[in-house]
Amino acid sequence: MIDNVRIFFGFDTKYQKDVKADLQQLKKDDKEIGEMIIELEKSKNVHSITRTKRGKSNSSGFDREKAKKDIPQGSIINYDPDVKTDINGNHRTPRIGLSHELQHSSDVDKGIMSYENIGNGIPMREIRAINTENKIRKRTGDAKRTEYRGRKIPQKLLE
């Protein structure tokens, strides 16, 4: 997922080393997340991780029209391992954000990206990603995430 520069130049950049370290730690943090990462690494679809542009937050890029039709595809994760805050400015261990985006990549890889919203407008795909990140939050000691863009996630949907 992160080796294109090494293949071209013959060495890893600091960014690549940091991302690889975060991926390895995620594999150790949670067995299910580790299996998800291995599935993405072995996928016939191409998934890559690139540095988030300055001033932007972590994100996953993919073809939304294909996703709405449940067509499996690759993705591009935008991730900055040096950003230690979430979108609201609260402290967050960086790999928590990576786990969230990896869940989106896994969903599009399998063709199961949900565009269904729950009653208060939160997309189910975000609840899935938040449940994934909460597994890592438990390991890092970061507070459990219970909201999405200021809206409370119903407790029954949180793992």
Regions found by a protein language model. Give the residues of each.
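Catalytic toxin/effector domains delivered as secreted proteins or via bacterial secretion systems
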Residues: I2-E159
